[in-house]
């Protein structure tokens, strides 16, 4: 998480290209002894903000560290190794527990996607990060096994940052693909693969890298070469494991012909609050946009999972655009026009919203469920926050805004 730059033209182009290049949506990967058939439907949720921090998911951790702490790099640099290890260990041991995995399964999910940074397995000299995350990832694999869930392990942050977003560990310029950063990423991925891919009864897939930012400057040719190296690593360790490949903010159809039939799943993310056009839409426009996106991804010749999406339609959540960065919705960001007032949407629970806002949120969620299950399913972002209406699945479930059971519809046939 998260796509954070405006790309109205790119979104429109992707929709046009994706529909124009559409191929039958029931394309299949080579049949192998996988623990999950990704030609089927993924229904799951991300465990965001746990083993890779994001200021908007746990703002208290960053507020307590002072103004300089805007990502995990600056947080650990500000606190120092000892204090950072103490703060993060407390967070890792309490934010997510075994009970969360059982609640996810009880809600009808079959998958969790768990972000992890390279620094957890392959720390580099002179970097401030602390390790210790793998103990908790080990626990998560056991909890998923006990709950009957499949796991996608997601390499969420790479050396140098592959997207410049705070969720990569370090906000700022994109330096991935410079120097030795790609080989360092392969080393980190290999360490994760060697540790977890043998547990194929639970770890059904592993993601090569989260959100490499091609529009932001990542070389597409270099990314394809990196994906080739990652596929080789997986084949060497456990060829029954599927590999998730991010679309890099291109249309999924633009990857047609690349590794088709190799147990590869395209991962695409869809948010409607980081673009000036999309954030301006009313609920009817948001529903149509989600349904159109569902049609677009059918143009892929590989399985496609929408690996991140949300029930929110504004960027009002505290620190969503980054710590200290204002909102587009209220017209405070980069001289944007004002679209509305954030009101109760900055923090707290979806229960604090008006009846109409809750109904619209449910309607938007239902449209996305229908749209994404038209291909190969979805992974909601995210399971838990300190209070972010529209983003917090457990809060949405508790307040009847996320369907339970998942097939329940108050707004049926929106994408028909």
Curated annotation (Swiss-Prot):
It is found in: Secreted. Keywords: Carbohydrate metabolism, Cell wall biogenesis/degradation, Disulfide bond, Glycosidase, Hydrolase, Manganese, Metal-binding, Polysaccharide degradation, Secreted, Signal. Disulfide bonds join 291-415, 316-342. The keyword Signal applies. Gene3D superfamilies: Glycosidases (3.20.20.80). Its EC number is 3.2.1.58. Pfam families: Cellulase. Its cofactor is Mn(2+). One of its GO terms (molecular function) is metal ion binding. Its main location: secreted. It comes from the Eukaryota. Beta-glucanases participate in the metabolism of beta-glucan, the main structural component of the cell wall. It could also function biosynthetically as a transglycosylase. This is Probable glucan 1,3-beta-glucosidase A. It comes from Neosartorya fischeri (strain ATCC 1020 / DSM 3700 / CBS 544.65 / FGSC A1164 / JCM 1740 / NRRL 181 / WB 181) (Aspergillus fischerianus).
């Amino acid at each position: 998480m998260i796509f954070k730059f405006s790309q109205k033209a790119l979104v429109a182009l992707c929709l046009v290209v994706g529909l124009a290049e559409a191929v039958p949506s029931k394309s299949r990967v080579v049949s192998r002894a996988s623990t999950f058939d990704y030609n089927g439907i993924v229904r799951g949720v991300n465990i965001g903000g746990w083993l890779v921090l994001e200021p908007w998911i746990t703002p208290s951790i960053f507020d307590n560290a002072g103004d300089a702490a805007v990502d995990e790099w600056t947080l650990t640099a500000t606190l120092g190794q000892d204090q950072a290890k103490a703060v993060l260990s407390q967070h890792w041991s309490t934010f997510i527990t075994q009970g969360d995995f059982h609640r996810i399964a009880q809600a009808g999910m079959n998958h969790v996607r768990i972000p992890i940074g390279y620094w957890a397995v392959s720390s580099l000299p002179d970097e401030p990060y602390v390790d210790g995350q793998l103990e908790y990832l080990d626990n998560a694999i056991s909890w998923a096994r006990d709950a009957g869930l499949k796991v996608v392990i997601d390499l969420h942050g790479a050396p140098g940052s592959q997207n410049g977003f705070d969720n990569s560990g370090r906000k700022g310029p994109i330096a991935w693909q410079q120097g030795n950063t790609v080989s360092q990423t392969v080393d980190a991925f290999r360490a994760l693969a060697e540790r977890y891919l043998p547990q194929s009864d639970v770890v059904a897939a592993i993601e090569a890298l989260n959100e490499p930012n091609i529009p932001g400057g990542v070389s597409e040719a270099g990314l394809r070469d990196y994906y080739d190296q990652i596929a080789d690593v997986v084949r060497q360790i456990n060829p029954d494991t599927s590999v998730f490949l991010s679309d890099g903010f291109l249309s999924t159809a633009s990857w047609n012909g690349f590794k088709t039939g190799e147990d590869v799943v395209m991962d695409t993310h869809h948010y409607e609050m980081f673009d000036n056009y999309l954030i301006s839409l009313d609920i009817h426009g948001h529903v149509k946009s989600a349904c159109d996106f569902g049609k677009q991804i059918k143009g892929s010749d590989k399985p496609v999972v929408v690996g991140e999406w949300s029930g929110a339609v504004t960027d009002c959540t505290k620190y969503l655009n980054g710590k200290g960065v204002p909102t587009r919705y209220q017209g405070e960001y980069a001289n944007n026009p004002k679209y509305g007032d954030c009101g109760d949407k900055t923090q707290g629970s979806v229960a604090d919203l008006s009846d109409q806002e809750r109904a619209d949120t449910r309607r938007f969620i239902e449209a996305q469920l229908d749209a994404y299950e038209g291909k190969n399913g979805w992974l909601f972002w995210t399971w838990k926050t300190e209070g972010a209406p529209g983003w917090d699945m457990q809060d949405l479930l508790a307040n009847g805004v996320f369907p339970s059971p998942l097939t329940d519809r108050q707004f049926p046939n929106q994408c028909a």
